[in-house]
């Protein structure tokens, strides 16, 4: 990522985008779509984010296509974030940890929802640490409907999103204060020769737990700069956020900790325009983010 910059491209094989690529809405169409996207993005971006819901539409064959996109992206030297937003309690959380960090669905990081309780995610946090992967928790989503819950004020005067950020910060501080263990150096804790998501270089060491904080909206949640983990920032392009919004909203974050994400706005360029469009956006982001 030190060479290719911070842009993360979402791979969302919706029926509309499959049609734009002149592909069938089928498992074969999913596989072809993903392979075309990865070929176009290879050497342009370092991180891709397949949206799992579009693969689940096709059942077991769709999940097999998801496994294929993870393998193809890794062969191309990319990191993969599985955008599945999983979250549950007790044994169910353990099962998600097994499926998404130790099983055949495992990518380099998984998105998670904290709304059954932040500490209910602990089995996935521990699995991320143990396997050298990342868990990226939804804190402030890019859709306006999220404000009703995420911006709600708690009895101590803080908001829900601030409370979630604070807990993530505690997890990362504990992890970074402990001796480094074995694991795969991905979007989680920095491994040999890496300095968090930015690769080798001046970026800080980052913990295994990151936050989803949308690039849309005004002032970012208080405490974001002390997160100690990756910030995944969706909403660039089709949802209305601009490169200038990203620069302003995340100016207080450490170098190489922010991953702005664009999906539909780039994919709608089609197979003939994706490579060039992603390259332009990557360069614009690299010019404004440390």
Describe the residue ranges of each PLM region.
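Acidic (Asp/Glu)-rich catalytic clusters
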Residues: 2, 38-44, 70-75, 125-131, ...
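Conserved N-terminal beta1-alpha1 strand-loop-helix module at the mouth
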Residues: 1-68, 72-81, 275-286
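A C-terminal functional module that forms or caps the active site or interfaces directly
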Residues: 211, 215-261
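Active-site-adjacent beta->alpha loops and helix N-cap segments on the catalytic face
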Residues: 57-72, 89-94, 116-129, 216-224, ...
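Conserved anion-binding
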Residues: 13-16, 84, 88-184, 198-210, ...
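Conserved, mostly hydrophobic/aromatic
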Residues: 9, 48, 83, 110, ...
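Short, well-ordered coil/turn segments that N-cap beta-strands
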Residues: 3-7, 43-46, 76-78, 106-108, ...
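C-terminal helical cap(s) of enzyme catalytic domains, especially alpha/beta-barrels
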Residues: 246-253, 257, 268-290
């Amino acid at each position: 990522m030190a060479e290719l910059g911070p842009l993360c491209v979402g791979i969302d094989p919706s029926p509309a985008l499959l049609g734009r690529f002149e592909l069938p809405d089928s498992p074969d169409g999913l596989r072809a779509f993903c392979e075309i996207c990865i070929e176009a993005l290879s050497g342009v971006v370092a991180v891709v984010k397949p949206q799992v819901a579009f693969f689940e539409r096709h059942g077991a064959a769709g999940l097999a296509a998801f496994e294929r996109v993870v393998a193809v992206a890794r062969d191309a030297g990319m990191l993969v974030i599985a955008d599945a937003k999983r979250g549950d309690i007790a044994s169910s959380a353990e099962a998600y940890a097994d499926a998404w960090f130790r099983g055949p669905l495992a990518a380099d990081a998984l998105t998670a929802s904290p709304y059954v309780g932040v500490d209910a995610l602990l089995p996935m946090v521990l699995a991320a640490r143990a396997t050298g992967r990342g868990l990226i928790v939804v804190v402030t989503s890019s859709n306006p409907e999220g404000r009703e819950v995420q911006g709600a004020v708690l009895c101590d005067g803080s908001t829900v999103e601030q409370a979630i950020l604070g807990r993530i910060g505690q997890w990362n501080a504990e992890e970074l204060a402990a001796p480094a263990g074995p694991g795969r150096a991905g979007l989680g804790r920095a491994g040999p020769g890496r300095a968090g998501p930015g690769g080798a270089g001046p970026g800080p060491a980052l913990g295994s737990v990151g936050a989803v904080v949308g690039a849309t909206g005004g002032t970012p949640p208080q405490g974001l700069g002390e997160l100690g983990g990756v910030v995944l920032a969706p909403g660039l392009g089709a949802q209305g956020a601009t490169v200038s919004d990203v620069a302003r909203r995340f100016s207080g974050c450490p170098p190489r900790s922010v991953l702005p994400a664009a999906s539909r706005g780039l994919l709608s360029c089609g197979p003939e325009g994706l490579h060039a469009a992603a390259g332009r956006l990557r360069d614009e982001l690299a010019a404004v983010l440390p």
